[in-house]
């Protein structure tokens, strides 16, 4: 059997979404079921079947979902409705839509390797250093009686 020519194939679109918070491992099948339930709840069974959605990639804090062309808005709306996956609270933030997976993979931010700093002393008080995304740094005071939080950026940390 010969493959169909490109003009007769079903056109697909891919949606890139960030998984918040970044869980290390969420199974693609579980994500598919959660998205399917959201689509069915919003648009019904007929529209859910017409979307032809699938989870292509799930990992590293990102999700790539496939759908038929013209229905990417419906998929993005359904992703925004999902609040729980496999008993874990989760949210999907739609970042981009493209016709190829390669273009979406270029948009994924690669995790930045940062040197781990265990403790930092500020004004005679010892703090635990927690480096977050986008150059944010949280300092949590060590001790069990009281916790004092300081919020810095990496530039402030380099000055010390």
From Swiss-Prot:
The keyword Hydrolase applies. It comes from the Archaea. Transmembrane segments: none annotated. GO terms for molecular function: ribonuclease P activity. It is found in: Cytoplasm. GO terms for cellular component: cytoplasm; ribonuclease P complex. It catalyses: Endonucleolytic cleavage of RNA, removing 5'-extranucleotides from tRNA precursor. Its EC number is 3.1.26.5. Pfam families: RNase_P_Rpp14 (PF01900). SUPFAM superfamilies: Rnp2-like (SSF160350). GO terms for biological process: tRNA 5'-leader removal. The keyword Phosphoprotein does not apply. Keywords: Cytoplasm, Endonuclease, Hydrolase, Nuclease, tRNA processing. It is an enzyme of class 3 (hydrolase). Consists of a catalytic RNA component and at least 4-5 protein subunits. HAMAP family: RNase_P_2. Part of ribonuclease P, a protein complex that generates mature tRNA molecules by cleaving their 5'-ends. Belongs to the eukaryotic/archaeal RNase P protein component 2 family. This is Ribonuclease P protein component 2.
